[in-house]
């Protein structure tokens, strides 16, 4: 039995540009990721952006990508979201969704 595309495990890196630091963006990203059952990480960069990696079923990752592009935390202002290094994976590299300091 083959898995549907929506159930295929994928990994994707992301970087979010805009007013995304000092507005609890990482905390909300972690909470949304966990709610969707995704694993990965999120951290602030020295350039004022937020970056990280998402892993999980493709359908859930797509949902999270849309959330990162359009929603974020209540006080954030997202200019744009960049997604790269997307690939199909056999197993998850993480066990949780973490905030990296």
Swiss-Prot record:
Query: Which residues does this entry mark as bearing N-acetylserine?
Result: 2
Please identify the protein, giving its name as recorded.
Acylphosphatase-1
Q: What is its EC number?
A: 3.6.1.7
Q: Which GO terms describe its molecular function?
A: acylphosphatase activity
InterPro entries, per database record: Acylphosphatase (IPR020456), Acylphosphatase-like_dom (IPR001792), Acylphosphatase-like_dom_sf (IPR036046), Acylphosphatase_CS (IPR017968)
Family recorded in the similarity comment: Belongs to the acylphosphatase family.
Keywords recorded for this protein, A-Z:
Acetylation, Hydrolase
Locate the active site: 26, 44
What tissues express this gene product?
A: Organ-common type isozyme is found in many different tissues.
Q: Which PANTHER family match?
A: ACYLPHOSPHATASE (PTHR10029), ACYLPHOSPHATASE-1 (PTHR10029:SF21)
Q: Where is the Acylphosphatase-like domain?
A: 11-101
Q: Which top-level group of life is the source organism from? A: Eukaryota
- Catalytic reaction(s) noted: an acyl phosphate + H2O = a carboxylate + phosphate + H(+)
Pfam families assigned = Acylphosphatase (PF00708)
